[in-house]
Amino acid sequence: MIRAFHRWPGLLALALVTLLALSGAALSVFPAAEQLAAPQASADLSVATLAGRVQAAYPGVEQIRRAPSGRVTAYWFDQGTPGAAVIDPATGQGVASADPGQVQRWLTGLHRSLFLGDGGRLAMAAGAAAMLVLSLSGVALVARRTGGLRHWFTRLRGPLAGRLHVEIARIAVAGLLLSSVTALWMAASTFGLLPETGGAPAFPAAVSGQTGIAPAQIVTLTQTPVSTLRELSFPYPGDATDAFTLKTDRGTGYLDQGTGALLAWADLTAGQRMSETIYMLHTGQGAALLGLMLGLMALGVPVMAGTGVALWLSARRGRPRIRDNQPASQAETILLVGSEAGSTWGFAATLHEALTRAGQTVHVGPMSDFAPETYGRARRILLFAATYGDGAAPASAAGFLDRLERATPLPEIPMAVLGFGDRSFPAYCAFANAVTSAACAKGWEALLPPDTVDRQSPQDFARWGRALGQRLGLPLELSHQPVAPRTQTLTLLSRRDYGAEVQAPTAILRFALPRQSLWQRLTGAGFARFSAGDLIGILPDDGAAPRLYSLASGRRDGFVEIVVRKHPGGLVSSRLTALHPGETITAFLRPNPGFRPGRGKAPLILIGAGTGIGPLAGFLRANRRRPVHLFFGMRHPDSDFLYHSEIADWQAQGRLTRLVTAVSRGVKPHYVQDALHAEAAQVTQLIREGARVMVCGGRDMAAGVTEALAEILAPSGLTPAMLKAGGRYVEDVY
Amino acid sequence: MKSLLATLALTTALTLPGLALAKPVTLSTTLNAYGGEGAYLAYYVTDASGAYVGSLWMAGGKSKYYEHLGDWYRATGGDTAQVNGITGASVGSGRKLDVTLDLADALFDAGYTLHIDAAVEDMRDSPNEIAVPLTTDGAGKAVQGRRYIASFQYDM
């Protein structure tokens, strides 16, 4: 719901908001420039002295104005010709032209009304309103994503566009809120929607009738410092009924032109002060530094517009059209999707198609539409639940748990929950788990035990599909490819073989970099940009789901390297480990930004076993200055010590600080978790120093490592979960 | 065609016999190319003693800017009721404004003066930009303003 309040104003007012922000940012420079350029009055200068100086220089002076920037301007009449100049308060002489610059005027016209008069003003006010709605809904979205306003500046994960969008927003939103609220106030004032704020005092009924007092003699003016002056208007020459008009930051008054007496005075009303403050906050006139900051924040708007559209497009692309979707009242299978970015819909579409082909009637809808009383012919309910942030319901599942709580369980319609998530997050499938517990507590029968799909894994999904097929008595083979990958051909350069003696035939395969088109190089698509830890996907010949391998090299290394262990009966691993130099495979690249060492100089603790050494070796090869401690588990050092010679070189070059190996084949089997226990003191010390832990390998090993670290860290009050939440403990598990 | 009668009836200042006799008068104002935003112009009449009688036209719709039309604002206290129904758009730099009104015959050759106050955003205010006596002889004779008005004349 909130997302809709963010998306539609954002898309509809995209151009308008961007234009407002850019012109506003450009205008924000002027008050500061004016303040720097204008000759400033000394602190003790009185209006009387200033007026005397100006009158001496320009005897026909009519008005002296002081801008909030401190710039003093005089207007005069000389032999029938009007003149004006910026005044140096020290001399009373003009030093520069008083007319505002063409550029500033043009920008102001654009910013305020697109040069379209009142219609343009209304359009720009609508733009400001859109900006306000975007800011408020954006705050709500960021708070939801980070788990509350308290976590406003928490670390972000995910694709660059989304991160950039939020990183900029959470700084710029303060300025954008201020600018849009003040803009709407000013627009309301322009269109007379605000109450009148009161004006000058009534002109005095009687004046002395005398003329000719020098401004320097007027007591009120001698007591008024120039820093408080707004405007001093001189009486009309030859009109004895006129008077001096003085406006200061306190109010407005009239001074007798014969006696200098203060004839009338009105303080600024609260409304006027409010208006002036809002004008200052919006324009930066009188608050140049604030203006510059607001301008800088406004510059974030075009970037947020671009990344916002990119996010919207990618979410749209991720949500496929579902053909032959049955109405909920007619379908045997109700498939409900709780998805945030839209990727889970793709899985639903795949299942919908497979079930429909098998002769089933299927309805696919968002989890937020859950209404079991309308499911007239349903035999089962399937729930695909992603998780948002720290366990919250994703966008399309908003309100689901409430609806579930209110609904009466239908014993004849069992339910199955499949969670979608990313194991490297602490709240893995937390929402799916919440749904499962809630359904269980309400007494819904479970069609299948709850299951999960990690990082859109096609394998996980296919496995669950087979279980579902078995339960339904249908052969169900789900082949889902989240994004149709664009493959490129890789040619094998060299291979090194290990592990045959310990029944773990493993090869380090090094491929040549594929040629990149100019467009790919510009956009960083395909293999034009990758780093160790990213994944390459290889499609098996039978069209099943692709197998993913972690990259052991980055683009700068000039080659594509992976470590593959041959699995008995594994189609892809068999094909890969049978490759000879010169032969080719087709592969696609999938970025894995969550598994990178990141910048900084904090120590790294790399933990891997078997082929899990691959990305870790890539990190070591690219390391320059960081202390790195590698825990490497193998079967036997004489057989599957992958990267043996390189590791020795890296140690000699200072890329690797310390190597701890664990050997599992021997008299006393030793695993990486044992090695961690043995080095508990140093591990604790490193983590206290801010070390980042990166784990790569099989799922059992990763679980063992987490357990070992939990025990090791317990005395220091830290837990792996805390490290994960802080982004200091990441896993790449298969 | 706007009628001054209704407007002047709002003010107590002008209760002359023979007011019913009126004729169309065209006020033609051409602005200098001063190169700024649209100018606000207040057209109003004072009597022989200089007292405000009534307004004829207001070019410029946003009342929050009226205080910059200094003399008019001082005379009326910024009362927008003075220009209700006789308000039009502001006049762009170098542009011409023609307004035709039914003016009472009694306003002519009786010591009344027509004033125009002008103001432009971010530029100097120009109260009393024009001050011409309303006389039958003066009709059709162009006068120049102090800053913004290149020429002004009224034709009967």
Task: Indicate where each model-derived feature is located.
Chain B
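Bacterial N-terminal signal peptides that target proteins for export
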Residues: M1-L8
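N-terminal signal peptide c-region/cleavage motif recognized by signal peptidases
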Residues: T15-P17
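Extended, low-complexity, turn-rich repeat/linker tracts enriched in Gly/Pro/Ser/Thr and Asp/Glu
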Residues: A33-G36, D122-R124
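Short coil-to-beta strand junction motifs in C2/discoidin
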Residues: E37-L41
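Structured domain cores in non-transmembrane regions
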Residues: A48-G111
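Glycine-rich, aromatic-bearing surface loops/beta-hairpins
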Residues: L103, D109-M156
